Curated annotation (Swiss-Prot):
Role description: NDH-1 shuttles electrons from NADH, via FMN and iron-sulfur (Fe-S) centers, to quinones in the respiratory chain. The immediate electron acceptor for the enzyme in this species is believed to be ubiquinone. Couples the redox reaction to proton translocation (for every two electrons transferred, four hydrogen ions are translocated across the cytoplasmic membrane), and thus conserves the redox energy in a proton gradient.
UniProt name for this protein: NADH-quinone oxidoreductase subunit I
The species this protein was found in: Chromohalobacter salexigens (strain ATCC BAA-138 / DSM 3043 / CIP 106854 / NCIMB 13768 / 1H11)
Principal location listed in the UniProt entry: membrane
UniProt cross-references to InterPro entries, sorted A to Z: 4Fe4S_Fe-S-bd, 4Fe4S_Fe_S_CS, NADH_quinone_OxRdtase_chainI
Needed cofactors: [4Fe-4S] cluster
EC annotation from Swiss-Prot or TrEMBL: 7.1.1.-
Oligomer status and interactors: NDH-1 is composed of 14 different subunits. Subunits NuoA, H, J, K, L, M, N constitute the membrane sector of the complex.
Amino acid sequence: MIKSLLEGTWSQLRTLGMVFMHAFRKRETLQYPEEPVYLSPRYRGRIVLTRDPDGEERCVACNLCAVACPVACISLQKGERDDGRWYPEFFRINFSRCIFCGLCEEACPTSAIQLTPDFEMSEYRRQELVYEKDDLLISGPGKDHNYNFYRVAGLSIAGKGKGEAQNEAEPIDVKSLMP
């Protein structure tokens, strides 16, 4: 009887000691709205559409992002400007379906789609999670500051022939390579 009483008392004292020691340890829980959450540098959050250094939107409506998306949350319609360049007449992302996998960013040849570390996108209604082009387009170039798709590839620049643009090689006559 005394043995069980001593064992019970020791167990209670040991428990109180552990509680007392844990009271002074660093807390594991973050008080989220007051304390910022640490995100890894490669965190994939909200999708944005960027502009090139000239201020034009980078998206050329190639539709590769919509094809690469495993949940089909991206839809767009191609239009053509007077100078022959393509642009998206509308660009829509349904964030209630998006799994933030980043495949659209990898598929984009112009670096127009980029994922930001913004993760606070909660809404009361699902319809408000469908973002249009005006909601997605930002004013800056995003991660690639000096990249301009039309300076590297695409349509020729007025006043310059083929092979004279920046980082462009002279054209090769493919038929001359045949045996």
